[in-house]
């Protein structure tokens, strides 16, 4: 029987052959049909998730508006200070340059221990990133004011304050606006990455689409961000057109220019107010909602929705903070700080990564529960019933070719395999580092990639061995051979609910509600739920709702 990857390759080759066999008119017709099909899927996505996209758009607008305002204020102030103070200039300009060179994800992660996750973190990073074009455009504009203009102003009796506001700053406005246009477009794009730290915004749609293999959702989120950036650039260009803002400040703007500037500002303020009002809980909840966090994967989105829907059914207000980048590394400290209230964790991750136990020790759930309560004031509320442990997988064809059943068998033939895994797999002691010591693999090549690209790389034959989670839907879709960990290297990764102890005091009924999920999901059930989201392209919320209804919860 043909593997799914081979089948897809045959379809692709057949499509290319048909395309080359067609005349130009037929090719154009096919292209039009494909475009209509894509647009149809996008329209359906927008229709089905209208409220979801409006929420994200409002969040994104507020993030960009606040960060853009702060960037403009601080950027101009720093640029002016650098212009007037040569010692400060020698320090400030290189620092602004340096901040811009730091990878954005690293900067987001850097501030998590200091100010936590969410909007505050996102605003700080966006402001630091957005300073460069504003600072340099302000500084260069002030520096380029001609000497004869300055002398003429002084000759007319301008004092230093008037010289700055009526000459330097007034002449610098067009260049500052040019810098602002660059900064705003950059902020619109950068704000999308803020979704990884729970800041919300349209990036959430992109990362959710990536994590759940939902290309339509990914494209929809990307298109809205692209449209947003075009409109944001257009907004700033109104002030720049025919030097409208400069002429307004110099009190010689035409009525048409005044009308355009004031209308532009009025529309902006209206949208800002509308976004703020939209994001106020529509059911006027006065009490602070519980924040449910998840890691960035389909399984976690589904489990997060199961928790959220179950608690909401019992009238407990919920806020979703799904797809937090870095997983446990960022969620656990945020939970301790109170930024999040509960999430799904795995016993193996808790045992090795959080509690720092050696891999040689067997995972002991009772010890995990006691230490979490004692050291972090966190409670484990039972286990769901499935073990999403690591394993390694290859194609069934390669398994048959080399007679591979176990990790040890793979080690003997590892020189014939290109191995791929997510970035953190190569760094963790309970993953690649320890695995190499236990099995002595000598792979032909190693490929680090985003966790959601492993299977695509396998399908495209860039790798032929990879790490998997035993509940992954793609194991079933691609008909992979999951190998046996014959030395028992990987610990158990039983899924359980971790919640702040204070929440149980506030909502004592939450404990009994969550305990209803104890032992309700086995490995096959979890793999099927993942399959519905990643392969059948169902919404995690719909899948979670159907699952709870089947359980009578």
Swiss-Prot record:
Residues 288-549 are annotated as: Ergothioneine binding domain. Disruption phenotype: Disruption of the gene inhibits EGT uptake. It is found in: Cell inner membrane. Residues 282-553 are periplasmic. It is a multi-pass membrane protein. Pfam families: BPD_transp_1 (PF00528), OpuAC (PF04069). Gene3D superfamilies: MetI-like (1.10.3720.10), Osmoprotection protein (prox), domain 2 (3.40.190.120), Periplasmic binding protein-like II (3.40.190.10). InterPro entries: ABC_Gly_betaine_transp_sub-bd, ABC_transp_perm/SBD, MetI-like, MetI-like_sf. One of its GO terms (biological process) is amino acid transport. In EgtU the transmembrane domain (TMD) and the solute-binding domain (SBD) are fused. In the N-terminal section; belongs to the binding-protein-dependent transport system permease family. This is Ergothioneine transport permease/ergothioneine binding protein EgtU. The lineage of its organism: Bacteria, Pseudomonadati, Campylobacterota, Epsilonproteobacteria, Campylobacterales.
């Amino acid at each position: 029987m043909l593997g799914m990857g081979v089948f897809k390759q045959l379809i692709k080759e057949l499509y290319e052959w048909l395309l080359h066999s067609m005349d130009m008119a037929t090719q154009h017709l096919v292209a039009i049909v494909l475009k209509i099909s894509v647009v149809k899927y996008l329209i359906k996505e927008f229709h089905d998730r209208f409220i979801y996209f409006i929420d994200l758009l409002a969040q994104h607008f507020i993030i960009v508006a606040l960060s853009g305002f702060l960037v403009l204020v601080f950027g101009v102030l720093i640029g002016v200070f650098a212009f007037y103070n040569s010692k400060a200039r020698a320090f400030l300009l290189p620092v602004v340059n340096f901040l811009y060179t730091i990878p954005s994800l690293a900067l987001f992660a850097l501030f998590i221990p200091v100010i936590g996750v969410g909007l505050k973190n996102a605003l700080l990073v966006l402001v630091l990133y957005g300073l460069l074009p504003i600072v340099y455009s302000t500084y260069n504009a002030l520096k380029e004011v001609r000497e004869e203009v300055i002398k003429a102003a002084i000759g007319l009796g301008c004092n230093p304050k008037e010289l700055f506001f009526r000459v330097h700053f007034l002449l610098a406005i067009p260049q500052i606006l040019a810098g602002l246009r660059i900064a705003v477009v950059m902020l619109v794009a950068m704000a999308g990455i803020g979704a990884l730290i729970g800041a919300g915004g349209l990036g959430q749609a992109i990362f959710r689409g990536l994590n759940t293999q939902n290309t339509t959702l990914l494209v929809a989120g990307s298109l809205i961000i692209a449209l947003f950036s075009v409109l944001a650039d257009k907004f700033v260009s109104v002030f720049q057109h025919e030097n409208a803002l400069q002429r307004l400040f110099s009190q010689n703007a035409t009525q048409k220019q005044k009308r355009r500037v004031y209308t532009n500002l009025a529309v902006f303020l209206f949208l800002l107010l509308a976004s703020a009002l939209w994001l106020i809980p529509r059911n006027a909840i006065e009490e602070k909602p519980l924040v449910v966090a998840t890691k960035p994967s389909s399984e976690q989105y589904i489990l997060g929705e199961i928790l959220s829907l179950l608690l909401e059914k019992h009238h407990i207000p919920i806020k979703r903070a799904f797809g937090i980048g870095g997983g446990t590394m960022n969620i656990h400290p945020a939970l301790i700080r109170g930024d999040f209230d509960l999430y799904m964790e795995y016993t193996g991750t808790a045992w090795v990564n959080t509690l720092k136990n050696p891999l040689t020790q067997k995972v002991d759930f009772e010890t995990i529960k006691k230490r979490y309560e004692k050291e972090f004031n966190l409670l484990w509320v039972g286990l769901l019933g499935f073990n999403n442990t690591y394993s390694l997988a290859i194609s069934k064809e390669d398994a048959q070719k080399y007679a591979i059943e176990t990790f040890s068998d793979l080690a003997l033939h590892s020189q014939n395999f290109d191995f791929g895994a997510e970035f953190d797999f190569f760094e963790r002691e309970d993953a690649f580092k320890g695995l190499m010591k236990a099995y002595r693999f000598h792979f032909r090549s190693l490929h680090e990639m985003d966790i959601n690209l492993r299977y695509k790389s396998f399908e495209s034959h860039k790798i032929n061995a990879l790490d998997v989670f035993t509940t992954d839907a793609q194991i079933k879709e691609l008909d992979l051979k999951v190998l046996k960990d014959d030395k028992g290297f990987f610990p158990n990764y039983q899924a359980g609910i971790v919640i702040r102890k204070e929440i149980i005091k506030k909502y004592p009924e939450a404990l009994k509600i969550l305990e209803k999920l104890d032992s309700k999901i086995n490995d096959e059930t979890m793999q099927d739920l993942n399959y519905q989201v990643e392969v059948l392209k169902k919404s995690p919320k719909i899948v979670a709702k159907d699952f709870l209804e089947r359980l009578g919860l």
